[in-house]
From Swiss-Prot:
InterPro entries associated with the record: Aminotrans_V_dom (IPR000192), Aminotrans_V_PyrdxlP_BS (IPR020578), Pser_aminoTfrase (IPR022278), PyrdxlP-dep_Trfase (IPR015424), PyrdxlP-dep_Trfase_major (IPR015421), PyrdxlP-dep_Trfase_small (IPR015422)
Protein name per Swiss-Prot or TrEMBL: Phosphoserine aminotransferase
Annotated pathway: Amino-acid biosynthesis; L-serine biosynthesis; L-serine from 3-phospho-D-glycerate: step 2/3; Cofactor biosynthesis; pyridoxine 5'-phosphate biosynthesis; pyridoxine 5'-phosphate from D-erythrose 4-phosphate: step 3/5
PROSITE patterns in the cross-refs: AA_TRANSFER_CLASS_5
Functional description taken from the UniProt entry: Catalyzes the reversible conversion of 3-phosphohydroxypyruvate to phosphoserine and of 3-hydroxy-2-oxo-4-phosphonooxybutanoate to phosphohydroxythreonine.
Record-listed N6-(pyridoxal phosphate)lysine modification sites: K198
Cofactor remark from the record: Binds 1 pyridoxal phosphate per subunit.
A GO cellular-component term linked to this record: cytoplasm
Quaternary context: Homodimer.
Length: 362
């Protein structure tokens, strides 16, 4: 079978070694003669999977002991509601920083539960899209928390600064597309959440890291399945969890640990991004309109100088084993998502194709 590199933004490419192990274990897991998808989530065998996954995840991100890790349903959009429902307490407003599509989506959902104080951080610098530095973010005095999205998959915009707003500011962040790609100081956040389908595992699982002093504040109308305290008290098993996604994510965590952990992923991700952006920047045929300080290392959107060639680019790249390069419908063009599971080899194959395509059509 020819090598395929999947540049999908999510569900995204998974490590080949993980898929191979899952394939080998699919019908006979742990010698039980059944699939992991068929065992009880409350049985000792799966409890071990769940406990190991949480431990490995904590190890990878150095999660402090005063933070709870929850394995949830609902995706990032579910957390757009869960955060205000759990963290507002008796307050009625929260600060929301708008830097792109997903931040705006979180704001739209939050309006159902509170009055967001929205700070538009988007700016244009020398004709390029950028984000105001955190020191310029205008936060209110009476907000229950501040929410932002460190990586915008559609816009290709990243906010790599570490929050430093003082101990009284509860920072909530949507890390769906950048979790585990670089070290983060978890202690600077009150809530971190991430849909699994980009850097963790299959779609259907969402991981929440929440500081324990924030538990117990849920709105009375908060659905039990979104209540952090209920999920924590029930070991993330208030109802039947997405067991296969949990199991496969656990395999990804072990793969990460075996391959140098988050620090090593950080180095490789930097190499991949530099290679791809280098080809774009050294060409008049391709362009990226994000300021270098805010370029995403996970999601690289780019446009061709002649959009009439877009269809041919996608057809030929697909035939070359470079899949899912079509840009999001909101922005068009191309987008290469190069999460942890994308090897440097895959990005090299893409850049080689781009250079050759430009030679023939530039």
């Amino acid at each position: 079978m020819a090598q395929i590199f999947n540049f999908s933004s999510g569900p995204a490419m998974l490590p080949a070694e993980v898929l191979k192990q899952a394939q080998q274990e699919l019908r006979d897991w742990n010698g039980l003669g059944t699939s992991v998808m068929e065992v009880s989530h409350r049985g000792k065998e799966f409890i071990q999977v769940a406990e190991e996954a949480e431990k490995d995840f904590r190890d990878l991100l150095n999660v402090p002991s005063n933070y709870k890790v929850l394995f949830c349903h609902g995706g990032g959009r579910g957390q757009f509601a869960a955060v205000p429902l759990n963290i507002l307490g008796d307050k009625t407003t929260a600060d929301y920083v708008d830097a792109g599509y997903w931040a705006a989506s979180a704001i739209k959902e939050a309006k159902k539960y509170c009055t967001p104080n929205v700070f538009d951080a988007k700016v244009t610098v020398d004709g390029l899209r950028a984000v105001k530095p955190m020191r310029e973010w205008q936060l209110s005095d009476n907000a229950a928390y501040m929410h932002y999205c460190p990586n915008e998959t559609i816009d290709g915009i990243a906010i790599d600064e570490t929050p430093d707003f003082g101990k009284d500011v509860v920072v909530a962040a949507d890390f769906s597309s950048t979790i585990l790609s670089r070290p983060i100081d978890v202690s600077r956040y009150g809530v971190i959440y991430a849909g699994a389908q980009k850097n963790i595992g299959p779609a259907g699982l969402t991981i929440v890291i929440v500081r324990e002093d924030l538990l117990g504040k849920a709105n009375i109308a908060c659905p039990s399945i979104l209540d952090y305290s209920i999920l924590n008290d029930n070991g993330s098993m208030f109802n039947t969890p997405p067991t296969f996604a949990w199991y496969l994510s656990g395999l990804v965590f072990k793969w990460l640990k075996a391959n140098g952990g988050v620090a090593e992923m950080d180095k490789i991700n930097q190499q991949k991004a530099e290679l791809l952006y280098g080809v774009i920047d050294n060409s008049d045929f391709y362009r990226n309109d994000v300021a270098k300080a805010n370029r995403s290392r996970m999601n690289v959107p780019f446009q061709l100088a002649d959009s009439a060639l877009d269809k041919l680019f996608l057809e030929e790249s697909f035939a070359a084993g470079l899949h899912a390069l079509k840009g999001h419908r909101v922005v068009g063009g191309m987008r290469a998502s190069i999460y942890n599971a994308m090897p440097l080899e895959g990005v090299k194959a893409l850049t080689d194709f781009m250079v050759e395509f430009e030679r023939r059509h530039g």
